[in-house]
Amino acid sequence: TPVLDGLAAKGVRFTDFHAGAAVCSPSRATLLTGRQNLRTGIYGVLQDHMHDMHLLEREVTIAEVLKKAGYSTAHFGKWHIGMTSGKRKKPSLQDHGFDYWFGLSNGAHPNHRNPTNFMRNGKRVGPMKGYSCQIVVSDAINWLETKANPDQPFFMNIWFNEPHSKLAAPDEITSIYGDLKDEAAIYSATVDNTDRAIGRLVAKLKETGKLDNTLIIYSSDHGSYRADRNGGLKGNKGSNFQGGLRSPG
């Protein structure tokens, strides 16, 4: 991950960084609000078609705070803290302070390659070509280039799907790490591909002269579901041991 390594080398690296919870939805609710997840209305992993729970509209997110301070706000990628599904009506991302959003209620389908379930401001986009992380960054770059006031300060909340299953990555990257059908190699390739996507975004910020005045924060919502990718820590995703809660920062 040369891009992330470069950002860490020029910034601050936290070696004892912890997520808000050991599973996805609660951790994301905590990250956006700074509050214990049960207070936000999120008490477990969310499935919109099955659950009424969602990030409560009364909760104040970082996007709402920054929007009130004059920032342009946007979300890109996985959401997973509540979207309307059928008769289960839930607040929109606009209700939570985002002027614009492009992403998914949960995972990419059928996998990270050529996903079919992305939405833009609540409307389905349809089948897309490419890989989720690159698709998300392309839309983020387009938003930066076309937002109404280029001089307005901005907050971008980018939540990548990779390296969550179901896995998919370009063969030319997977082959660097092993056999094309090896799940561990594909997992590594999704991390590599995400690093390359982040590199494109950093390059755009540099090209537009915004990089030196932009704070970039990179982390994860919990530990890996692969026990062999948790740095020897006890436990993994879903566990309240360090392997479930420690994350990069």
PLM features per residue range, with description:
Residues T1-G249:
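Formylglycine-dependent sulfatase
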